[in-house]
Amino acid sequence: MSNRVVCREASHAGSWYTASGPQLNAQLEGWLSQVQSTKRPARAIIAPHAGYTYCGSCAAHAYKQVDPSITRRIFILGPSHHVPLSRCALSSVDIYRTPLYDLRIDQKIYGELWKTGMFERMSLQTDEDEHSIEMHLPYTAKAMESHKDEFTIIPVLVGALSESKEQEFGKLFSKYLADPSNLFVVSSDFCHWGQRFRYSYYDESQGEIYRSIEHLDKMGMSIIEQLDPVSFSNYLKKYHNTICGRHPIGVLLNAITELQKSGMNMSFSFLNYAQSSQCRSWQDSSVSYAAGALTVH
């Protein structure tokens, strides 16, 4: 056994967001300073994973709800964009680099998850190609900077899970979600609309295309706020909305359902919604972003 520390580089720095630490810090600070925090700290958040010029201000609404003084472990659940995966995968590295500071993976929790036999390992190549987890690392580092040596991360790449697998993983993660010192970050964009995404749902009663997209997204968002995994699955089957993080969201909803059985009282609220551009013609395209937080009462 070698004791060499293996690092995942910040492979999207310099393209999806700035590679300059001071510049990145100033941008994140700017976005966070424009946002209100709610009264209760978040136990879980849903936030987008696009380039920061598109979604940085939206994501701030979720990260503003994180309380660094109580958070000790951060589970980051992101969808797989590049490799076919029918389960969930764990990283094979020790450290995730960011332009702000390095984040340590929690090898103790990784050991517990690995023992279940429900996970596979992703290669370093897969890890560095994937942006769905990485785009949350600078925001995580920024939100936690006052306690930077006191927390670990648990990155999980979520595959194209069946409903029964979402339930199984939800059950597994529910015991971690029950712990107030854990935070779950669920990585998802919302509707990807236009020819390049092969998705062009349009409800003409809504008027302009972008309004139809917003109506469709907000229908899904209100179902997520009801914390009902079955209704969310049915919504996706009916409208096929291109929500890329639907499986991580499904896992979170199933974990919540599991905790509600034992009487835990939780609520989820979306705090911001945005679109990369406003579609008005069939030639246009856009991606939607939403940020929200789960609180425990």
UniProtKB/Swiss-Prot annotation:
PANTHER family: PROTEIN MEMO1 (PTHR11060:SF0). The modification Phosphotyrosine is found at Y210. GO terms for biological process: regulation of microtubule-based process. The gene is Memo1. InterPro entries: MEMO1_fam. This is Protein MEMO1. May control cell migration by relaying extracellular chemotactic signals to the microtubule cytoskeleton. Mediator of ERBB2 signaling. The MEMO1-RHOA-DIAPH1 signaling pathway plays an important role in ERBB2-dependent stabilization of microtubules at the cell cortex. It controls the localization of APC and CLASP2 to the cell membrane, via the regulation of GSK3B activity. In turn, membrane-bound APC allows the localization of the MACF1 to the cell membrane, which is required for microtubule capture and stabilization. Interacts with ERBB2 phosphorylated on 'Tyr-1250'. It comes from the Eukaryota. Keywords: Phosphoprotein. The keyword Transmembrane does not apply. It holds the Pfam family Memo. Belongs to the MEMO1 family.
